[in-house]
């Protein structure tokens, strides 16, 4: 008998509600279909949203300062550092300034993935949320 493990859900009946799905997903159960066994032992529901406008604005201000951009240069959350003239050293300096401003530590692997103001703001909010309570006070 073959065994198949999965972490995804398929909705076939339009009458299925979110609460029914969450109840079913939170319990540990196995369902057998002929030769295949599907087990839902662990399922996480992850909801993410864009960073707060305040965080995006603070990141924009730091980017303008680090890149010595004129005050009238328009920046949006989608503005790419490279399109603003930033090279790899500029990006490192931006990340260092963000770490100092928000009192966070950005892993090198995360820093290399930051290419836009929005990505930086999202990462900052994620790191701030994960900080222990003692560090945030």
Swiss-Prot record:
GO biological process, one term: fatty acid biosynthetic process
Record's subcellular location: Plastid, Chloroplast
Pfam families: PP-binding
Targeting signal (transit peptide) range: 1-48
GO cellular component, one term: chloroplast
InterPro entries: ACP, ACP-like_sf, ACP_chloroplastic, PP-bd_ACP, Ppantetheine_attach_site
UniProt key word Transcription: no
Primary localization class, coarse: plastid
Keyword flag Lipid metabolism: yes
Residue ranges of every copy of the Carrier domain listed in the record: 53-128
Any one GO molecular function term: acyl carrier activity
Residues carrying O-(pantetheine 4'-phosphoryl)serine: 88
UniProt modification remark: 4'-phosphopantetheine is transferred from CoA to a specific serine of apo-ACP by acpS. This modification is essential for activity because fatty acids are bound in thioester linkage to the sulfhydryl of the prosthetic group.
Keywords in alphabetical order: Chloroplast, Fatty acid biosynthesis, Fatty acid metabolism, Lipid biosynthesis, Lipid metabolism, Phosphopantetheine, Phosphoprotein, Plant defense, Plastid, Transit peptide
Upregulating conditions: By light. Down-regulated by sucrose in the dark.
Role, per record: Carrier of the growing fatty acid chain in fatty acid biosynthesis that plays a major role in the biosynthesis of fatty acids in leaves. Required for the biosynthesis of chloroplast photosynthetic membrane lipids such as monogalactosyldiacylglycerol, digalactosyldiacylglycerol and phosphatidylglycerol. Is essential for the biosynthesis of the cuticular wax and cutin polymers in leaves, and for the establishment of systemic acquired resistance (SAR).
UniProt cross-references to HAMAP family, sorted A to Z: Acyl_carrier (MF_01217)
Entry's family note: Belongs to the acyl carrier protein (ACP) family.
Protein's name according to its UniProt entry: Acyl carrier protein 4, chloroplastic
Lineage of the organism: Eukaryota, Viridiplantae, Streptophyta, Embryophyta, Tracheophyta
Gene name of the encoded protein: ACP4
